[in-house]
């Protein structure tokens, strides 16, 4: 009596799409690479500790960009460090995501006006998917940002990159934010 010999009943059948299965697998197993540069890195480390337990979300930190699918940029990115951030981003396999954590990586933080050596936001050198505000943000805020990344992954489709999808939306003059809201309402209605 093997698994193939068992009778299939209505309770054993699962109907879904390949997109949903792949997206579920990717969002249930995020492997972030933390790029801690300042005080935000301390909060990022606290999030990985036992009090918050990121492993319950399927999030396992990695130290190599070749093994990670999410880059968390936490802290002040200087002009000299920008080249290394780009290099690490390019070494990550597709699909890859970026979470910008804290005011310094979002917009330059307290150095935005007089800090000639500070990049005024990491989004000037690499594409950022989710911004987590704060100086430094609490671990709860980082967990909220990670859950937002999981929501983005849940809405992706096979064969269409995020860049292509956004270009198509721009050509049709459709607001992507409205589509996300419509998808959420549809998911809640069913």
Curated annotation (Swiss-Prot):
Binds 1 [4Fe-4S] cluster. It comes from Chlorobium phaeobacteroides (strain BS1). NDH-1 shuttles electrons from NADH, via FMN and iron-sulfur (Fe-S) centers, to quinones in the respiratory chain. The immediate electron acceptor for the enzyme in this species is believed to be a menaquinone. Couples the redox reaction to proton translocation (for every two electrons transferred, four hydrogen ions are translocated across the cytoplasmic membrane), and thus conserves the redox energy in a proton gradient. Belongs to the complex I 20 kDa subunit family. NCBIfam families: nuoB_fam, PRK06411.1, PRK14813.1. Keywords: 4Fe-4S, Cell inner membrane, Cell membrane, Iron, Iron-sulfur, Membrane, Metal-binding, NAD, Quinone, Translocase, Transport. This is NADH-quinone oxidoreductase subunit B. Its cofactor is [4Fe-4S] cluster. InterPro entries: NADH_UbQ_OxRdtase-like_20kDa, NADH_UQ_OxRdtase_20Kd_su.
């Amino acid at each position: 009596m093997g698994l193939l010999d068992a009778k299939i009943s209505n309770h054993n059948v699962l109907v879904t799409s390949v997109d949903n299965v792949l997206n579920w697998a990717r969002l249930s197993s995020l492997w972030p690479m933390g790029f801690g540069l300042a005080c935000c890195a301390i909060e990022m480390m606290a999030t990985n500790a036992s009090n918050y337990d990121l492993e319950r979300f399927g999030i396992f930190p990695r130290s190599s960009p070749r093994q990670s699918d999410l880059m968390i940029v936490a802290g002040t990115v200087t002009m000299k460090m920008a080249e290394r951030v780009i290099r690490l981003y390019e070494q990550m396999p597709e699909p890859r995501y970026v979470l910008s954590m804290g005011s310094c990586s979002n917009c330059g933080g307290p150095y935005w006006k007089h800090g000639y050596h500070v990049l005024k936001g990491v989004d000037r050198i690499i594409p950022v998917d989710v911004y987590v505000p704060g100086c430094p943000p609490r671990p709860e805020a980082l967990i909220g940002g990670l859950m937002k990344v999981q929501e983005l992954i849940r809405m992706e489709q096979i064969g269409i990159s995020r860049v292509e999808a956004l270009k198509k939306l721009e050509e049709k003059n459709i607001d992507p934010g409205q589509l996300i809201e419509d998808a959420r309402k549809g998911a809640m209605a069913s």
